[in-house]
Amino acid sequence: MKWKGRRQSSNVEDARGRKVATTAGAGVLLNLVGRRFGIKGILVLIVVGFVLWKVGLIDPSMMVGGPTQTQSVPVEATPEEQERFDFVTVVLADTEDVWKSELGRHGQPYPEPTLQIYRGRTQTACGAGMAQMGPFYCPADQKVYVDLGFYDELERSFQAPGDFAQAYVIAHEVGHHIQTLLGTSQKVAAMRGGPDYNEYSVRLELQADYYAGVWAHHNQRYLDTGDIEEAIRAANAIGDDAIQGRTKGRVLPHTFTHGTSEQRMRWFNKGLQSGRIEDGDTFSIPYEDLCGQFPHLNLALPSSAFRQSSYSGLGAGSLCHCSGGTSFAVSGSAT
């Protein structure tokens, strides 16, 4: 991908030097008092703490364990890490340009998300964020969170190397920001706990893949040979069936929340071909039609690319089956 020397987004928060910790506070103190003086000692401590709090001599957070605290330390980044940092800021800038234009076609503004780069652990408006979660978007603070170490995992464990594979991940998370702006995410979140929630979660994720494809469509002038293949490999590698097959040795379609490899490749490619937000409605079509046939691009994809035939007892298309056929009218259009 041709990215060096191009505009970098200013909506980037470098949190790599932040150390996040939760104060142990009362938990440790109550444990010590309980061991030494028993329940009576604990009761006395609580009463004393309450009195001191009422007269303003202590912060109440000291008695409940305290809030999450952060401490900043100097950032020491390798040249490779700093290059990745610069790269994702350019990718974010590209998404800003694309979505400002695309939503503008429909007369809507584009409030830009913030990208936070962190290491290991961070605090978000959606709760604690950890590197093990991979990149994610928090609708409560409208931020995308990325630990740059994930890209090593993407290359090593998911066999999806390349800078455009990394860009696809950012574009997918920004797709969730678009869904938040349009109200789609909120409607799906309201169904949490319902019998068909997983189905709508898959639809939501596939639409974010579609939006990543829309971004790629409008950035083709910056692509190198093989970039699209990198994104397709990444979409293939992080399908629910691919991940379950790799980690569990079997596939459980009813537990899918993000879509199969074939579905994710298909909807990214659909967005790439269209380039229009209004063609990405994954909610009004029957669930089984989310599959379709992904066009072969003569790629040297891993054998997991079309995994349906890899599992005994699963017929063609069965990985796309989900019980329930509830109508859910959510438009992917900004109009």
How would you name each of these model-derived features?
Residues G239-R307, Y311, S318-L319:
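Pan-zinc metallopeptidase signature
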Residues V174-A189, N219-Q220:
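Catalytic Zn2+-binding segment of zinc metalloproteases
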Residues R121-D147:
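Catalytic zinc-binding patch centered on the HExxH motif and its immediate surroundings
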Residues W99, Y168-L181, D209, G213, ...:
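Active-site recognition of the HExxH zinc-binding catalytic motif
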Residues P79-Y110, L115, D196-E199, R203-Q244:
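Short helix/loop segments within enzyme catalytic domains
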